[in-house]
């Protein structure tokens, strides 16, 4: 694969600490073989997450100086609200300090004990917020999502037939909303097609069930739709994103991903009664509805970042970076989720170390080995993160044992 030129100049740098193998072995032992307990400075290449770890642009840094820190009705809030409404087309906009806060407010207002929340795949904080309220987080990925080496174009899709069976089994009264995660992080950063979203919209409309989008990587999903779905190749990413949100009744968002910021999120909805409940909880948990736990300068940076995330040249670079890594690893026979996801490389730990059974956590073994070998910090997305106990108390492994190497935005070059 050809070298990609990063579409930006670097204005500021941070030195990397190069450690020896012996130092890394000692650090990992002191961290009890839990990479989350490592000191960040001991991680030469930190691919633990793409959330809040990116580099802001010069325009975002400049926007910080415009921050209006008024408690209520600040100029920064107005700019933030205007940008979110432009992209989503949704009336009620509530800022939060990050995405999980938006999920928690949604869950507390809407979910009751025993409710079922179907999703293409919940990520960990979404699942935790559903289950904390006594709900059942039900993953319904499309069948091809489980075939990691099959390069289907939209492996993030939901199983629409499975969703229909779920609704018929549990009943509309037990499903306060259906959720779609774009892109599907748990399933390998894979995209959701517009056709799949429309099919879900048609189905939930029939049963009068609201549709909520987990929009953390909405711009990356829009790029995939532009590149892979017929009829969208001549549309702007903003136009595609607007169509995507037009199919939803609301959305949660971590602006630490496709807001290109280090903190922040939002919750949007069309339902006036929901919005009133959301605002009341926002005041209690986060802050006044025009700042939501964020400084005015953060609202400014997010407003700029949301626009920059929809820049086509940026997305070309972003996806080419991931594709380059996938191609290089594939060339030497490393099993992984194909095709390349939008924000990360997902290694198939079950195939990499087939002698380690799932209940002995092959993903953790691969994560620790990568750190010892090269100072690379990444994360397991398998039975440690998503495993469950069955009714007898026995451990039930996750369907997939993945290791995610998530790429912080605009931080590392191809040389890294």
Predicted regions located by residue number:
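Active-site loop ensemble at the mouth of alpha/beta enzyme cores that anchors a bound cofactor
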Residues: 322, 350-378, 392-398
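Short acidic (Asp/Glu) and glycine-rich catalytic loops that position anionic groups and cofactors
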Residues: 279-282, 300-308, 343-352, 398-405
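PLP-dependent enzyme catalytic core of the Aspartate aminotransferase-like
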Residues: 385-416
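Beta-rich nucleic-acid/ligand-interaction surfaces
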Residues: 102-105, 344-349, 387-389
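Conserved alpha/beta core surface patches that mediate binding of polyanionic ligands
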Residues: 161, 283-287, 378-391
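Conserved PLP-enzyme active-site core in the AAT-like
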Residues: 2-33, 37, 43-54, 60, ...
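Short, conserved charged micro-motifs
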Residues: 276, 354-362, 410-416
């Amino acid at each position: 694969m050809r070298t990609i030129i990063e579409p930006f100049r670097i204005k500021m740098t941070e030195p990397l600490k190069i450690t020896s193998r012996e130092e890394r072995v000692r650090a990992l032992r002191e961290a009890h073989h839990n990479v989350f307990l490592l000191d960040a400075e001991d991680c030469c290449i930190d691919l633990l997450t793409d959330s809040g770890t990116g580099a802001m642009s010069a325009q975002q840094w400049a926007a910080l100086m415009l921050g209006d820190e008024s408690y209520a009705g600040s100029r920064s809030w107005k700019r933030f609200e205007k940008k979110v409404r432009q992209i989503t087309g949704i009336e009620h906009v509530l800022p939060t300090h990050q995405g999980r806060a938006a999920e928690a407010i949604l869950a507390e207002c809407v979910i009751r004990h025993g409710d079922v929340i179907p999703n293409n795949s919940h990520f960990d904080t979404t699942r935790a917020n559903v289950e904390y309220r006594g709900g059942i987080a039900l993953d319904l990925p499309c069948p091809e999502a489980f075939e990691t080496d099959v390069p289907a174009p939209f492996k993030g899709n939901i199983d629409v037939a499975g969703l229909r069976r779920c609704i018929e089994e549990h009943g509309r009264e037990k499903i306060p909303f259906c959720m779609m995660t774009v892109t599907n992080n748990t399933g390998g950063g894979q995209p959701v097609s517009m056709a799949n979203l429309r099919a879900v919209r048609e189905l939930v409309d029939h049963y009068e069930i609201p549709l909520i989008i987990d929009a953390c990587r909405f711009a990356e999903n829009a790029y995939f739709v532009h590149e892979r779905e017929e009829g969208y190749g001549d549309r702007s990413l903003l136009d595609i994103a607007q169509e995507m949100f037009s199919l939803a009744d609301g959305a949660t968002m971590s602006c630490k991903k496709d807001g290109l910021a280090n903190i922040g999120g939002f919750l949007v909805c069309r339902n006036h009664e929901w919005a009133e409940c959301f605002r009341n909880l926002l005041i209690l948990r986060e802050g006044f509805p025009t700042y939501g736990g964020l400084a005015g300068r953060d609202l400014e940076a997010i407003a700029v970042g949301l626009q920059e995330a929809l820049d086509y040249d940026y997305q070309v670079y972003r996806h080419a970076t991931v594709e380059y890594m996938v191609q290089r690893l594939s060339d030497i026979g490393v099993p992984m989720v194909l095709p390349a996801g939008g924000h990360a490389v997902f290694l198939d730990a079950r195939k990499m170390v087939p002698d380690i059974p799932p209940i002995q956590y092959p993903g953790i073994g691969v994560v620790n080995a990568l750190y010892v070998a090269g100072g690379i910090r990444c994360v397991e997305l398998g039975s440690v993160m998503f495993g469950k106990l069955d009714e007898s108390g026995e451990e039930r492994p996750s369907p997939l044992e993945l290791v995610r190497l998530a790429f912080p935005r605009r931080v590392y070059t191809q040389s890294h």
